[in-house]
């Protein structure tokens, strides 16, 4: 192929799919392959990915393993949580929010090496292909993207494993003796798809859950923690200042211990089909509850309701791969403006799969006890004022009722 790329940067996990892609790129395109492996806090030792890349013929200087945990939480997770973003009412977007960061580094490494293409291991059925590619094109309109799943004839897991065996590519086995697939993990969440999960009528087996204890097996006594915020971002746990990634790591441990953040969800993919996944987002679930708790006393009602109204659109943009779009950045500016006074501390109760706000306080609080008290408010609020307020708001309803009565 005359227009075939000479150098390709591959988003490489060291797993089955991307190891096969690495070999396929070498044989199909005859190109030099550069690998990028992101340490997103997935909890795996990444040195095996380096070793496997070298085993497959990648030069040491072309292997990039980058710790992006702080960048991930600071620049992607935290901005998203300022919006309380949830897709279709349930999904905390753990996979979606990692893709633009990976694409960013793919493009940067491509520029560093003078590569003319990037490649990913997302299938032609899922959302990730869209997320990777929209992000890459937004960052470099001239970049070429190779998506092997849309090109090759290895259209099933069986064919992939056969290809791996024919090319001496090591295949990891999970504890049930099966080749693992469709598991995505990072500091925010773990997702599992396929295998025993494809029939949405069947309850997911216990072995699918990798990150949290079963709520039934969680401690029989509740635990209380305090999370402090500055301008919408978590900055401390129990009074101890921590970095963004360290905060999420600590919250993950609290959530793991108490069985918090499990979700069995059938979602609507951007490409049009429904898919079923098991999501575990222990720390993120705690963080979301805490952020909502501090907003309750620091966010003006009009600003809060407006923010709530745009959240579904904001979440949809992230889910569909439009992190780098003008409209997401516009919404982000509005959301960030809303967080100027979202500073304070929330006390949370963790117990058997649940997380509940039980206290919140802030120097920026809009909560006025003297106005809402059931006792004597010492003149802070004149209840007679409510009569005029109600009359004005009832005016249009009366006019409509009178009009309708004339046409009965």
UniProtKB/Swiss-Prot annotation:
Listed GO MF terms: argininosuccinate synthase activity; ATP binding
Residues the record lists as binding L-aspartate: 123, 127-128
Assigned protein family: Belongs to the argininosuccinate synthase family. Type 1 subfamily.
Cellular localisation: Cytoplasm
Family annotation (InterPro entries): Arginosuc_syn_C, Arginosuc_syn_N, Arginosuc_synth, Arginosuc_synth_CS, Arginosuc_synth_type_1_subfam, AS_cat/multimer_dom_body, Rossmann-like_a/b/a_fold
Lineage: Bacteria, Pseudomonadati, Pseudomonadota, Alphaproteobacteria, Rhodobacterales
Gene coding for it: argG
This protein's name: Argininosuccinate synthase
Quaternary data: Homotetramer.
């Amino acid at each position: 192929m005359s227009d075939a790329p000479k150098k390709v940067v591959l988003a490489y996990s060291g797993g089955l799919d991307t190891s096969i892609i690495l070999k396929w790129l070498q044989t199909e395109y005859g190109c030099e392959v550069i690998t990028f492996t992101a340490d997103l806090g997935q909890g795996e030792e990444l040195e095996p990915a380096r070793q496997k890349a070298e085993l497959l013929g990648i030069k040491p200087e072309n292997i990039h393993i980058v710790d992006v945990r702080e960048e991930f939480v600071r620049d992607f997770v935290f901005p998203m949580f300022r919006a309380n973003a949830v897709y279709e009412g349930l999904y905390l977007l753990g996979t979606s929010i990692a893709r633009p960061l990976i694409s960013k580094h793919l493009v940067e490494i491509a520029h560093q090496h003078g590569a003319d293409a990037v490649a990913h291991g997302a299938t032609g059925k899922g959302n990730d292909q869209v997320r990777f590619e929209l992000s890459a094109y937004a960052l470099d309109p001239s970049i070429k993207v190779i998506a092997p799943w849309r090109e090759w004839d290895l259209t099933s897991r069986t064919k992939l494993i056969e290809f791996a065996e024919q090319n001496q590519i090591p295949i990891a086995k999970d504890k049930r003796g099966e080749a693992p697939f469709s598991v995505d993990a990072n500091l925010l969440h773990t997702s599992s798809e396929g295998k025993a999960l494809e029939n949405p009528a069947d309850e997911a087996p216990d072995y699918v859950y990798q990150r949290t204890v079963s709520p039934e097996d969680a401690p029989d006594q509740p635990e209380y923690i305090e999370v402090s915020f500055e301008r919408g971002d978590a900055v401390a746990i129990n009074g101890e200042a921590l970095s963004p990634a360290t905060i999420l790591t600590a919250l993950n441990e609290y959530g793991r211990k108490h069985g918090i953040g499990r979700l069995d969800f059938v979602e609507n993919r951007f490409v049009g089909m429904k898919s079923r996944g098991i999501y575990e987002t222990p720390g993120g679930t705690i963080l979301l509850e805490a952020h909502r708790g501090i907003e309750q006393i620091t966010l003006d009602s009009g600003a809060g309701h407006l923010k709530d109204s745009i959240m579904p659109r904001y979440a949809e943009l992230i889910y569909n791969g439009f992190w780098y779009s003008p409209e997401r950045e516009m919404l982000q500016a509005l959301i960030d403006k809303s967080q100027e006074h979202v500073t304070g501390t929330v006390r949370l109760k963790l117990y058997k799969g649940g997380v509940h706000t039980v206290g919140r306080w802030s120097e920026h609080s809009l909560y006025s006890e003297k106005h809402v008290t059931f006792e004597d408010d010492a003149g802070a609020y004149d209840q007679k004022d409510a009569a005029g307020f109600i009359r004005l708001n009832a005016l249009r309803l009366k006019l409509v009722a009178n009009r309708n009565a004339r046409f009965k």
